[in-house]
Amino acid sequence: MEASVHIGNSVPHAHLHSAAPARPADPVRPDGSRRALRIGLGGPVGSGKTATVAALCRALRDRLSIAVVTNDIYTREDADFLLRHAILPAERILAVETGACPHTAIRDDISANLEAVEQLEATVGPLDLILVESGGDNLTATFSKGLVDAQIFVIDVAGGDDIPRKGGPGITTADLLVINKTDLAPHVGSDLQAMAADAKRQRGERPVAFTSLTADNGVGPVADWVGARLTAWTAA
């Protein structure tokens, strides 16, 4: 059992965590209605996860009821960024301080994140979508199916155009791979066509989205994918 700290808005409290459930989370609320779709966003430090979360919220918040859970090891920096830029009202953003390797809190011991998700459902709901952002991690980071229903993995061209070729569970198994900061490709010498080809070899038919969040509607391909997942989720 591992102790860590969970921040709900700004009130910290300690938890003793148990192992993550192996089976997918129940899609139905206690009242029989379908709960919010939960999508996890993972990726290396600096790849643009928080910026992607912010852009998704801006693109979708006028038509969907959204909440966010962020993960940081010792701070609530990502949550503070979202609050500072008025991405969502404060009550729709919860921060988890993992106190350990970021992947532990999203895959091996999800209890703090699961509590945050369930707290949002209970206090802010009904919600359509909850985004769970992992702390920055390496290419092996994946989410437990007991926490999220789908996973987005974010990399960026500044990390090198060989990243898709290197693979790793984040690259190969995520439901959507996002290759971010395409506007920087000419400046860092990254070959977008090579990245696309390598991603295709690693992922087969799983989708890949190229994004530049500095462009108008730069998050559009990701927002469209989320919208399609939500349509399928609510129709199930």
UniProtKB/Swiss-Prot annotation:
Q: Is the keyword Kinase in the record?
A: no
Q: Does the keyword Lipoprotein apply?
A: no
**Where does the record place the region Disordered?**
1-40
Biological process GO annotation list? urea catabolic process
Q: Which GO MF terms are attached to this record?
A: GTP binding; GTPase activity; nickel cation binding
Q: Which UniProt keywords apply?
A: Chaperone, Cytoplasm, GTP-binding, Nickel insertion, Nucleotide-binding
> What is one term from the GO cellular component aspect held by the record?
cytoplasm
Residues annotated as binding GTP are: 43-50
Per UniProt, subcellular location reads as: Cytoplasm
State a single Pfam family of this protein.
cobW
Family from the record: Belongs to the SIMIBI class G3E GTPase family. UreG subfamily.
Indicate the quaternary assembly. Answer: Homodimer. UreD, UreF and UreG form a complex that acts as a GTP-hydrolysis-dependent molecular chaperone, activating the urease apoprotein by helping to assemble the nickel containing metallocenter of UreC. The UreE protein probably delivers the nickel.
Physiological role: Facilitates the functional incorporation of the urease nickel metallocenter. This process requires GTP hydrolysis, probably effectuated by UreG.
Protein name, as recorded: Urease accessory protein UreG 2
- Which organism is this protein's natural source? Saccharopolyspora erythraea (strain ATCC 11635 / DSM 40517 / JCM 4748 / NBRC 13426 / NCIMB 8594 / NRRL 2338)
Q: Show the taxonomic lineage.
A: Bacteria, Bacillati, Actinomycetota, Actinomycetes, Pseudonocardiales
